[in-house]
Curated annotation (Swiss-Prot):
Protein source organism: Vibrio atlanticus (strain LGP32)
Cofactor, how bound (note): Binds 1 zinc ion per subunit.
Obligatory cofactor(s): Zn(2+)
Protein name: Large ribosomal subunit protein bL31
InterPro entries: Ribosomal_bL28/bL31-like_sf, Ribosomal_bL31, Ribosomal_bL31_A, Ribosomal_bL31_sf
Family statement drawn from the similarity comment of this UniProt entry: Belongs to the bacterial ribosomal protein bL31 family. Type A subfamily.
UniProt subunit comment: Part of the 50S ribosomal subunit.
GO BP terms, alphabetized: translation
One Gene Ontology cellular component: ribonucleoprotein complex
């Protein structure tokens, strides 16, 4: 590798809004970053995920135009 052309690789601290803090190595210029969600508070990883099914495009079409096809 050429000397002097690569960014500095250093430890960076990440703090989540839930209070979880962890460190990782990165080329970021910042010493710390703030996260909105992490694996400790994200609904998918905590098992609190809800599936919201509002119906698809086909259901919406059938609701609007389904009566027209049954009149034949």
């Amino acid at each position: 590798m050429k000397v002097g052309i690569h960014p500095e690789y250093k430890a960076v601290s990440a703090t989540c809004s839930c209070g979880n803090t962890f460190e990782f190595n990165s080329t970021l210029a910042k010493e710390s970053i703030h996260l909105d969600v992490c694996d400790k508070c994200h609904p998918f990883y905590t098992g609190k995920q809800r599936i919201v099914d509002t119906g698809g495009r086909v259901d919406r079409f059938n609701k609007r135009f389904g009566a027209l096809s049954s009149k034949k």
